[in-house]
């Protein structure tokens, strides 16, 4: 695949949603997803059953991130609040959700990355942590020295040694020793963007050589410093302004990177890739007609197309399955604002061809403000919400 096609796949996705004069957009697909009772597909009759939930009277918990490193193994990083203290922890199951073990942490969790059950990393607010014991024991490693104003939000590893750390700021970092030491990716420092306005959001590799990283750069306006739920009328009136979408790509396993910039009204917040295909999840502002949308990516041709866009749903995560199928986890808010602190309803959809979608039955107790998906093995699917709910497809 030519470099210009590789980069065009992702940079075209958010830009295609709304460029130039505003135009009336339609929901995608035009027909509503099939109801669970209408579905006749391969997952018909299966449902998302609650496997773990934090349920205490005097304490509350929120999940920062969730992953499934191996079949039957699920790990949720959470923050427990109550009794005048805050306790970071992970909860782990190694038997498919039949039993769970809680392990206290020494750092507030930000995100997780799992290479497999033997190699698991946790980004904390202060340090990087590593587990070779399914998340049951953690040893301290180092985060890049990027300063408090440029925190690291995520890591990605190709193997137990080679990885990258990224987050706020245009410079991201690389490691060759599993996170013991880090060095800046030199090409990222040369990107012609304002450092304090830039952030990296997602990284994916198609194989051991070809990979991409996505981010954006957008000036922070004064009226955007308050969350929408604190000034809902103002949030709905905000004028949508374009940001700069930035995509980096490598064809040599991260030894070198090249970058492309484009103006877009959306931000790519997550990319999932498998073989020659991928899904990109874009996010828009509160005053936009749609909270976001999902694009299908074809890395062989450089093509992309919208496959899921609904007015009342914000897709947070996606999982690519065998045979070209996909699952989406979305939040339906309780009001008009998607950043409301009031938890919304978890809704899950799947498609075998990315054209027709069917909704799946989800336990009514599953709600939150953010959703996570993980598919550790064929036929095994997990979901979670930040309101401390973990579910498995049964």
Where are these regions (language model features)?
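Residue-level hotspots at or immediately adjacent to binding/recognition sites across diverse folds
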Residues: 20-394
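N-terminal export signals
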Residues: 5-21
């Amino acid at each position: 695949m030519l470099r210009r096609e590789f980069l065009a796949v992702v940079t075209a996705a958010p830009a295609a949603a709304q460029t130039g004069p505003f135009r009336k957009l339609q929901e995608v697909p035009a027909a509503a997803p099939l109801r669970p009772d209408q579905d006749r597909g391969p997952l018909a009759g299966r449902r998302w059953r609650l496997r773990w939930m934090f349920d205490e009277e005097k304490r509350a918990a929120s999940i920062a991130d969730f992953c499934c490193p191996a079949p039957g193994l699920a790990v949720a990083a959470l923050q427990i609040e109550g009794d005048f203290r805050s306790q970071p922890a992970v909860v782990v199951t190694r038997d498919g959700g039949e039993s769970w073990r809680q392990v206290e942490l020494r750092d507030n969790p930000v995100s997780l990355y799992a290479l497999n059950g033997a190699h698991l990393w946790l980004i904390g607010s202060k340090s990087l942590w590593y587990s070779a014991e399914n998340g049951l024991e953690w040893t301290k490693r180092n985060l890049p020295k990027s300063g408090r104003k440029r925190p690291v939000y995520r890591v990605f590893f190709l193997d137990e040694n080679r990885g990258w750390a990224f987050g706020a700021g245009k410079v991201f970092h690389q490691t060759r020793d599993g996170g013991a030491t880090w060095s800046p990716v030199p090409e990222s420092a040369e990107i012609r963007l304002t450092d304090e306005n830039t952030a990296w959001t997602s990284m994916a590799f198609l194989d051991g050589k070809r990979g991409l990283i996505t981010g954006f750069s957008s000036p922070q306006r004064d009226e955007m410093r308050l969350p929408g739920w604190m000034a809902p009328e103002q949030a709905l009136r905000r004028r949508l302004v374009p940001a700069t979408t930035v995509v980096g790509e490598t064809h040599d396993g991260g030894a070198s990177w090249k970058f492309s910039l484009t103006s877009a009204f959306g931000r790519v917040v997550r990319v999932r890739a498998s073989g020659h295909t991928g899904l990109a999840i874009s996010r828009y502002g509160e005053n936009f007609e749609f909270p976001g949308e999902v694009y299908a990516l074809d890395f062989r041709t450089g093509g992309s197309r919208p496959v899921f866009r609904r007015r009342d749903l914000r897709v947070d995560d996606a999982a690519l399955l065998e045979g070209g199928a996909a699952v989406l986890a979305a939040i339906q808010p309780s009001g008009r604002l998607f950043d409301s602190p009031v938890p919304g309803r978890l809704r899950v959809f799947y498609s075998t061809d990315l054209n027709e979608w069917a909704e799946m039955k989800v336990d009514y107790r599953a709600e939150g403000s953010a959703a996570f998906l993980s598919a550790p093995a064929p036929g095994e699917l997990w979901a979670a919400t930040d309101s401390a709910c973990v579910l498995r497809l049964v």
